[in-house]
């Protein structure tokens, strides 16, 4: 298995990232968050996020399939000069295969100009 880490660029990649976001959100939080809250995180909402915020998102591809993503950027508190990792999600079938580590390393490289990175 060769995983490719790259910027999210095409409509197919945006759709793939949206599906990963929705599926992994359910897998991670279904037993933690109330059902009424979970029901608000729809595939359409994930599509909206992916389309509205395509910049600073790296995807992990297994062949042409999106299997994970990381979103990063400037820390949300402008009083603090730092980079931030906003989201990191990997499909359950890819746990333990180093995909999350590859995504984090790529995000750290993209945030290289910062002395501090906040998770």
Predicted regions and their residues:
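Extreme N-terminal starter segment of soluble prokaryotic enzymes
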Residues: 2-4
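Acetyl-CoA-dependent GNAT
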Residues: 7-93, 104-106, 110
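Conserved GNAT acetyl-CoA-binding A-motif
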Residues: 111-119
């Amino acid at each position: 298995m060769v995983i490719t880490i790259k910027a999210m660029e095409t409509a197919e990649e945006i759709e793939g990232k949206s599906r990963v976001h929705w599926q992994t959100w359910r897998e991670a939080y279904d037993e933690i968050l109330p059902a009424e809250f979970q029901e608000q995180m729809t595939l359409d909402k994930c599509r909206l996020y992916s389309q509205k915020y395509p910049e600073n998102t790296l995807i992990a591809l297994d062949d042409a399939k999106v299997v994970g993503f990381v979103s990063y950027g400037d820390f949300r508190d402008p009083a603090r000069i730092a980079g931030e990792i906003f989201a990191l999600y990997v499909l359950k079938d890819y746990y333990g295969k180093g995909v999350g580590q590859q995504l984090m390393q790529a995000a750290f490289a993209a945030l290289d100009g910062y002395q501090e990175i906040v998770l």
